[in-house]
Amino acid sequence: MSKEDNVMNSFEEQANELMKERFQKLKELQSNGKDPFDVYKVERTHTSKEVKENYEDLEGKTVTVAGRLMSKRVHGKAGFSDIHDRYGKIQLYIKINDVGEEKLKEYKTFDIGDIISVTGTVFKTKTGETSIHITDFQLVCKSLRPLPEKWHGLKDPDLRYRQRYVDLIINQDVRDTFMKRTAIIKTMREYLDNKGFLEVETPILSPIAGGAAAKPFITHHNALNIDMYLRIATELYLKRLIVGGFEKVYEIGRNFRNEGMDIRHNPEFTVIELYEAYADYNDMMEITENMIAYICEKVLGTTKVQYEGTEIDFTPPWRRLTMVDAVREYAGVDFNTIKDDIEARTIAKEKHIEFKKELKDCTKGDVLIGLFEEFCEDKLMQPTFICDYPVENSPLTKKKRGNEAFTERFEGFVFGREVCNAYSELNDSIVQKERFMQQLKERELGDDEAYMMDDDFITSLEVGMPPTGGLGIGIDRLIMFLTDTHSIRDVILFPTMKPQPNNQ
């Protein structure tokens, strides 16, 4: 058994004893007609933040606050305590002359973690700390399970994620991260709304998993007796709305992919996709860099952020680099001189590039992407748009003007990681159907992430979709960069976890 396991077991043993004591206190409260769970509402007049920010107006006046008791230093006839609410903490002062002997005795029985409401007058201590001089109080929820005394001392890497509610109680920096997450998404909406985009909602359950190369989660609809998929992307439904005349749309929501989990991947994750009629991928680059800069300025106050000890500068314009140029710069291979698939496979073999399919089935485009992923991605530390992807790897994208071996697609990279993906959207229904047919062949070769045929989407393109630019941004990854967070689990409130034995 590891040292960390011993610490956890010791804590659980202590917690069990303390829980017995707390259950006994609850029984006594209930027998005395003071059951905290009979409290339905608290008439709170102020939050901790409001008391502190409005001290000059509130000094000497009576307020009622509520929160979780996080420290208690009451000895003899007086003492101090701290309660925490959403906005932070505020100090309380209690004295026997103000509440009486019985009430003070009751207050002393409160445990760390209990939730109380307090009424009292606002004042400042000799050290200048804004506090509340208690005249009355009420226990509104009894905490039966004790909080860890030293949360950072617990080494179980999963515990904070499994018990996020405790993590949020104990760690101010965790609360700050998720408050920033909310602010980032709110500001993203604000930017797009101000640009005339319309926020919409599209299906999460669909008979076809489309819009991305990924493994879907499969479920079954009993009434219709059909298998359905949790969406892997919102793209194809949003494009249908462009066809329908909604010229600027976006959706922020969860996507689901039945794939591996690591510090950058969670099976369900938050993405924004947006589409603009009469625009192309150059416009999407401008939206990306300008929107992220706007978010940085509004939420963080700067476009220069620290991430894992490196300064990342999100100031527009970002660097623009074609994939061919990136491979030439970082892998030392000039793809403009590669004549065909056979020559490309030879290069792949020399460079020891591995693929999901057999090397003999790989195209020149497959090899280009393989070289990029192997030699280039991790070099792209500052925000960079990698442009012009091979046509065979971008089935929903228009061909590059002037070079039909490539497409008008870019991905944005920061700190060696992809954060966004965008196209000049393919709107030719005939070509789109041909691309889908080629993807079906890829599936037959064993690529279970290749696109499915979506006949209704083809039908919508036959009705007619104007030239359109489309963009998708991984919100979780963006938030990781803007909060200097190492793992995606640290920016998702309740990340996917393997159940523990006995559901513990």
Swiss-Prot record:
Enzyme class at the top of the EC tree: ligase
Cofactor(s) required, per the database record: Mg(2+)
Record EC number: 6.1.1.6
Coiled-coil ranges (or none): none
Keyword field: Aminoacyl-tRNA synthetase, ATP-binding, Cytoplasm, Ligase, Magnesium, Metal-binding, Nucleotide-binding, Protein biosynthesis
GO-annotated biological processes: aspartyl-tRNA aminoacylation; lysyl-tRNA aminoacylation
Reactions mediated catalytically: tRNA(Lys) + L-lysine + ATP = L-lysyl-tRNA(Lys) + AMP + diphosphate
Protein name: Lysine--tRNA ligase
Native source species: Clostridium botulinum (strain Hall / ATCC 3502 / NCTC 13319 / Type A)
Gene responsible for this protein: lysS
